[in-house]
Amino acid sequence: MRITDVKVFELEGPPRSGLALYEIQRGGLTPEQVTPYRQTFTEIETDAGITGLTIGGSTQVKALGQSLIGEDPICYERIWEQLYKRTRDPRALSVLDLGLWDLIGKAREEPIYRLLGGPVQECIRAYAAMLGFSTDPQAAAKRSRECVEK
């Protein structure tokens, strides 16, 4: 398996409901007037049809990603050393690092936590933030119950 392309692209859509509900966050705008949500992604493609997808990307990621073309993504340590020699931009390294781990996990049909050595503990406490969800007490209470049930 070899890396054939690294693409950086942006998706745009309307804000999700529940975001920017607080007047101070919107600056007096109605929810319809709030700027559309934009997010950049990076996708690492291979000749085997397996792709690694991660959030984030930039012109630096795009340029650095071109050095991955032709590489075997399973040779992670060698690739990481090459990337580190080419840049000290931690954001660009992080984006490509996450994309490579996603790709390796898909190729091996293993979750990333297992590739990194397995679980450290059997369970963790869940945390659910509700910042920006709703100022209505009943809606917040309903959402709190939903979070507890999950």
Give residue ranges: language-model regions.
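Metal- or metallocofactor-binding catalytic centers and their adjacent structured scaffolds
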Residues: E43-E110
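Short Gly/Pro-enriched turn/cap motifs at secondary-structure boundaries
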Residues: T30-T35, I55, R88, A92, ...
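Conserved structural scaffold segments of CAZyme catalytic domains across common CAZy folds
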Residues: L98-L100, E110-R114, Q121, A139, ...
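Structured beta-strand/loop patches that form or line metal/cofactor-binding pockets in enzymes
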Residues: M1-A48
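Glycine-rich, charged/polar anion/phosphate-binding loops
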Residues: R26-L29, I112, A141-K142
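Metal-dependent enolase-superfamily TIM-barrel catalytic cores that perform enediolate-based chemistry
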Residues: C123, Y127-K150
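N-terminal small/glycine-rich loop or linker at the start of catalytic domains
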Residues: R108-G132
